[in-house]
Amino acid sequence: MNLIQKYDFQIKLMVILLSIIQPFILMSICGELWSISNYWKSPLQPMFIIVNAATSYFFFSTDRWVIPSIFLLLLTAFSLEMYPTIHNVFAGCFFLSCIYPLLTLKRFKFFGLLYLLSILVLLLVGMLWFEIYCVLILGSYHLTILIYKHNLDK
C-alpha cells in the first residue's frame, strides 16, 4: 500500500474542505471579485491552481466524476486572463457536467435538486455567488459520500 492509499480518506477530506473554504479565503484577503476565476490575477493564484488541481484529481478518482474532473483541470489550465473565451467555455462545461452525476444519484438525491437551484442564485446575486453556491453543494455532497463510505468500511 502506497502513501496515498494509506491516507486516502484524510487526503480526500482535506481536498474537500479546502475546496469549500477556498472562495471565502479568497474573498477575505482579496475582496469580492466578479467570479472565482478572477482570483487568478490575485496574489492567491497558487491557491486557486492547487485547490482546483487537487479537486480535479479527487474527482478523477470518483465514479461518474471524470468528465467534470477534466473540465475543472482545463478551466484551471486556461486562465481567464490569457484565454477568456476558452476558460469560460470550460467553466460552463464544468458546472453543467456536474448536473448529471448529481441527478442520477441513488442516495442523497436532494443534492441534485439543490444544485439545480443554483440558476436562481446566478440570476439573483451574480456569478461569484452562483459559483460559491455550486462549490458548496458539490463539496457538501462529496463530503457526505466520503463520510458515508468511510463509516461503511469500518
Give the residues covered by each predicted segment.
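Hydrophobic cores of alpha-helical transmembrane segments in multi-pass inner/ER membrane proteins
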Residues: 20, 48-59, 94-107, 134-149
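N-terminal topogenic module of multi-pass integral membrane proteins
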Residues: 1-62
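Membrane-proximal helix-loop-helix units in multi-pass membrane proteins
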Residues: 65-113
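Terminal transmembrane helical module of multi-pass membrane proteins
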Residues: 109-154
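Juxtamembrane membrane-water interface segments of multi-pass membrane proteins
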Residues: 1-5, 32-34, 60-63, 80-82, ...
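Membrane-embedded alpha-helices of multi-pass membrane proteins, especially ion channels
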Residues: 22-27, 59, 72-78, 101, ...
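Juxtamembrane "helix-exit" motif on the non-cytosolic side of transmembrane helices
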Residues: 28-32, 77-83, 121-129
